[in-house]
Every structure is written in structure tokens, then in C-alpha cells.
């Protein structure tokens, strides 16, 4: 046995090579260092890689065979396992399977000399975290470690940095005049940062929340100033463009009818129009991630008409008319005296409105069908026969679940606990969609030659601040908008509509006014003010003026098959 050299065996200082590099400092492992297990029968040849990782702050343990790797993983916890595919005895793939049985959460990186595709597919099928081809460079190993262990942190820090850099630009835009299409760009940026910063630094999120609040304040002023001009232009038959955006009553004419072919022609393929009630843009972006697996998605935008409530915006969509014109054309089907936006009868004639719109604006021989789905059992039955929609030229499908979720959260303590804030509410609706009959229906439609159009009638805003309103007993009951006689409200906290016709709205009588809550406010009467303030606080509501309620996507989907 060779005795290790001691100090007495060392050559005198003058005999040592003066230019010899000192050994690199090798930090001692600490409890907070990421731990790596590396299994390779030629691990001695990879010593420079190990030293490089240790110098970068990783604790690396090495073994020379798959069996030892499995034993070490069973005995201890590692943050990453590097596994050579070709080792004597227990091979890499077999070791991978046993490691995953013991520690399914541990990321395993397969390293191999083989470039055969079936080996890659086999390893990927067994849920490896990465696949590297020898020879590997130390920095390649480091990059893999950073991606697996620090990826979320690095991405989060980068998003925060990007937002803080964009903050000044956004603030400058919000401080100046914006056109209707520029407001859409600002809103898209805010929503993207909202999604990307989810779970990040709370101080940065607070900055974003404050900027969101400022944006909604400016947006309300913009709507109050410009909306009557848009209504005038629309009633003068001016098409959406620079002077006005696409509004609710334009959607069928602008985004659906062109897909049905020219007047007198035949549609190239069936069109299925989905209206998902109360769907916000941030929710849509998460739904879209699932749909992009099956469809090419092209997104346009529309502004919901006011009030952003189902009896107005959804009837306008299917009728192709502003509410005041709808009331004149269908006095027995659309009343100007709307008192409760939750009353199903207020939207009982959407199929008749759509048929009338097609007859007026396109042609009478369009074959259409209409369905409204409000329960899970109705949805399951719909998914079972969804391909029947392809037997006609145009199908219109109203999906009420997201709206029901928003209203149910207001009344359910359990739902409030499950979805206590906007990100959780978003996540809850996304989880539903991914596992729903609706997602199944879209997958089936993606297998056929058809075009799908998806939009919403309005969004919803998390309402946290009450504002007092005074009205008589005949005043409508909605929390984000009201209409009645001689309404009184603080003009700094709502939009007051003295002349309903200026907003394209029907007038039920003399001195009839409308008011729309702005930002995150909701209306409460002075009587029992604190009781109802507390009762309705932190509800997702609609009917008023906010970016979340008004700005809505119109998506056209074509199967990728």
C-alpha cells in the first residue's frame, strides 16, 4: 500500500516549478447547495466537468454504475441526476425507470453517445428532463442545471426587469391621448405582464396593480369622451375603422358573415360561432394555449357596448343592432325596461334575432342552428353530438359556465376560498376548461374542415370599492350599472348618462338615466350601506366600464390537421 506523501516528502520550494498553476478552489458542500448525482462508468474522464460544476456552486456526487445510482437516490435526495445511457450491469434506461419509481419528482438527464431516434423516444417516454449527446461541454451541463433548477427564478427575474423597463413607456402612453386601437395594445401589455408576474415579487406586482388602476381610471375618461361619437358613427352606418372600433353589434357582420361566402354563393365550410359569456381576455389567453394544440388562432378585438351586461351586449351581438334599435325593431321581444340582468327571459330570443340579422344582412337561405348551454349535463350531451353542427352553414353556441362561475363565486364561501384573487379565479376557470365538455367539443371540431369563431359578450372585473347611489324603487338592481329616474351618483366614480340615445340605449320614460360604475367600483344604496358594502365586496361583476369588461377578443380558429 502506497503511503500518501507528507510535508517531509515535498520538494524544497526552490525545486518546485514556479509557473505551475495553483489548484482551483473547491468549495465545501453546504446545505443550500444544489445536489447533483452523476452516474457514468467513465466518470474519471469527466472530472473537469465535475470541478467546473462545483466551482459554480453545485455539490456533485459521482457513481460508476446504474445500480449505485438507484441506491443513492433511494437513500438521499438529489436535485438533478445525470445518467449515462450505456453502463455495464444496470443500463441507463433501466436505472431511469427505477429512479422514477423511487423519486418521480427528481429530474433525470440522460447522457449518451447514441443518436438513434428510438433511444431518444424511449427516454422521453420515460419522462426524462433532458437528453444530451456526448461529448458534452461543461457549460452545456451548467446550462442544463440552470434551466432545471433555476429556470423559474431566472425567468421571473427577467420578467420583472422587463416590466420595470416597460413601466415608464406604459406610464407615458397612459398620460397622453390614446386611440381605440392603442388602448387594446396597452391592455394586452398589462395582461401579459399580469400573467408573467404571477407568483413573483409582491412589490413588483403592487406596482403593476397600481398601474392597472391608473389605466382603468384613464380608460373610463376615454370611454366617457369617445363612446357617444362611436354610437353616432355606427348609427350613420360608418364601418369599424380608424374613427371607431368594432362594437358588439358589428361582430356577426364583420367576423362571421365573411366566412359564409358572398351573397348568393355557398359557404366553403361550416362556421361554428361560440359565445362564451363573461370571458375576460386573460382567461382567453389560457384557454388559447389548449386550443393551439389543434387550431391556428387569429385574434381580432371588439369593444363591448354599454352597459357591459348580457341583456344589452349579447342581444346586440345576435341582433346586429344597438339596444335602442333592437327595442324599436322588436318591441315585444326586447324591452327598454330591463330590471334584472340575470333574468333568462331577457335573452330568450337570440336565435330569432340572429335569423333576422342573416336575412337582412346576408341571405335567407343560410342554414343555421342555435344552442344555449347552461348545465354540465347539457354540455356533455352537446359534446356527444357536436359534429351535427357541421350539417348546417352556421351554428351559434352560447356557453354560460364562465358567467355562472363569476356569479357563484359571489355567493359561495368555498369558491371564494378556492379563488381568492384574480390569478386563482383565472386558474379555476382554466382548470374547468381543460377538463370540460367544451374542450372535448373543440377537439372533435378540429378533426373536420370547419371554421370556429370564439368571442364573449362582456368580461368581468373584481369589484372592491363601493360607491353610493340614490334612486327610486323602480331602479334596476344591477351592481355595476343602473337605469331609472333621477339617479344620483358621484360623477367622479361613475359615468352618468343623461340622454340614453347618445349611448344607443332605449329610454323607458321621462327623466330616464343610466349610470355605469368605473374602475373596480359597485353601487350600493345609502340604506344599510355597510351591510351591502360588505356583502358584495370582492365579487366579479360586470355592467360597468373597465378594461376587463369592455375589451374582448374575437378569435378565428382553423384546424391544423
Regions found by a protein language model. Give the residues of each.
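Active-site beta3 strand of CheY-like receiver
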Residues: 77-82
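Short amphipathic alpha-helix used as the core "switch/output" element in two-component signaling
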Residues: 71, 93-104
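Alpha4 helix (beta4-alpha4-beta5 surface) of REC/receiver domains from two-component response regulators
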Residues: 94, 115-130
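C-terminal output helix
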Residues: 118, 136-145
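Feature captures the catalytic ectodomains and active-site-proximal regions of enzymes
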Residues: 3-17, 86, 121, 151-561
Amino acid at each position: 500500500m502506497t503511503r500518501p506523501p507528507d510535508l517531509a516528502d515535498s520538494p524544497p520550494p526552490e525545486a518546485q516549478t514556479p509557473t505551475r498553476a495553483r489548484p482551483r478552489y473547491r468549495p465545501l458542500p453546504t446545505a443550500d447547495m444544489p445536489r447533483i448525482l452523476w452516474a457514468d462508468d467513465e466518470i474519471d474522464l469527466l472530472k473537469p466537468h465535475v470541478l467546473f460544476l462545483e466551482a459554480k456552486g453545485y455539490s456533485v456526487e459521482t457513481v460508476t454504475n446504474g445500480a449505485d445510482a438507484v441506491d443513492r437516490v433511494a437513500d438521499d435526495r438529489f436535485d438533478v441526476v445525470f445518467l449515462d445511457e450505456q453502463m455495464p450491469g444496470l443500463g441507463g434506461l433501466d436505472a431511469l425507470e427505477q429512479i422514477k419509481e423511487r423519486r418521480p419528482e427528481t429530474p433525470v438527464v440522460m447522457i449518451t453517445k447514441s443518436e438513434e431516434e428510438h433511444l431518444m423516444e424511449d427516454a422521453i417516454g420515460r419522462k426524462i428532463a433532458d437528453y444530451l449527446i456526448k461529448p458534452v461541454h461543461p457549460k452545456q451541463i451548467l446550462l442544463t442545471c440552470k434551466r432545471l433548477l433555476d429556470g423559474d427564478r431566472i425567468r421571473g427575474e427577467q420578467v420583472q426587469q422587463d416590466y420595470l423597463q416597460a413601466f415608464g413607456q406604459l406610464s407615458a402612453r397612459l398620460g397622453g391621448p390614446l386611440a381605440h386601437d392603442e388602448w387594446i395594445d396597452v391592455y394586452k401589455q398589462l395582461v401579459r405582464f399580469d400573467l408573467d408576474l404571477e407568483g413573483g415579487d409582491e412589490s413588483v406586482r403592487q406596482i403593476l396593480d397600481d398601474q392597472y388602476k391608473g389605466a382603468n381610471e384613464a380608460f373610463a375618461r376615454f370611454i366617457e369622451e369617445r363612446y357617444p361619437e362611436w354610437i353616432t358613427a355606427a348609427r350613420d352606418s360608418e364601418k369599424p375603422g380608424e374613427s371607431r372600433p368594432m362594437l358588439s353589434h358589428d361582430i356577426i357582420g364583420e367576423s362571421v358573415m365573411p366566412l359564409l361566402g358572398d351573397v348568393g354563393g355557398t359557404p366553403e365550410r361550416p362556421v361554428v360561432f361560440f359565445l362564451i359569456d363573461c370571458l375576460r381576455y386573460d382567461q382567453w389567453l389560457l384557454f388559447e394555449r389548449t386550443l393551439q394544440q389543434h387550431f391556428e388562432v387569429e385574434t381580432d378585438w371588439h369593444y363591448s357596448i354599454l352597459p357591459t351586461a348580457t341583456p344589452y351586449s349579447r342581444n346586440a351581438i345576435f341582433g346586429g343592432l344597438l339596444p335602442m334599435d333592437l327595442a324599436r325593431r322588436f318591441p315585444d321581444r326586447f324591452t327598454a325596461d330591463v330590471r334584472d340582468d340575470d333574468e333568462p327571459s331577457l335573452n330568450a330570443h337570440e336565435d330569432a334575432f340572429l335569423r333576422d340579422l342573416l336575412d337582412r344582412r346576408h341571405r335567407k337561405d343560410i342554414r343555421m342552428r342555435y344552442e344555449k348551454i347552461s348545465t354540465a349535463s347539457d354540455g356533455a350531451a352537446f359534446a356527444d353530438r357536436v359534429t351535427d353542427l357541421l350539417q348546417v352553414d352556421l351554428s351559434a353556441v352560447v356557453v354560460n359556465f364562465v358567467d355562472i362561475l363569476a356569479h357563484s363565486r359571489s355567493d359561495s364561501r368555498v369558491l371564494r376560498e378556492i379563488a381568492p384573487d384574480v390569478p386563482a379565479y383565472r386558474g379555476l376557470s382554466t382548470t374547468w376548461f381543460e377538463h370540460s365538455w367544451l374542450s372535448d367539443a373543440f377537439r372533435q371540431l378540429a378533426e373536420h374542415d370547419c371554421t370556429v369563431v370564439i368571442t364573449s359578450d362582456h368580461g368581468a372585473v373584481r369589484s372592491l370599492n363601493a360607491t353610493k347611489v340614490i334612486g327610486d324603487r323602480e331602479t334596476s338592481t344591477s351592481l355595476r350599472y343602473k337605469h331609472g329616474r333621477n339617479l344620483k351618483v358621484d360623477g367622479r366614480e361613475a359615468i352618468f348618462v343623461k340622454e340614453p340615445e347618445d349611448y344607443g340605449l332605449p329610454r323607458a320614460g321621462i327623466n330616464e338615466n343610466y349610470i355605469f360604475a368605473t374602475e373596480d367600483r359597485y353601487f350600493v344604496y345609502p340604506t344599510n350601506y355597510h351591510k351591502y358594502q360588505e356583502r358584495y365586496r370582492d365579487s366579479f361583476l360586470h355592467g360597468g366600464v373597465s378594461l376587463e369588461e369592455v375589451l374582448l377578443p374575437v378569435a378565428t380558429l382553423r384546424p391544423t390537421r
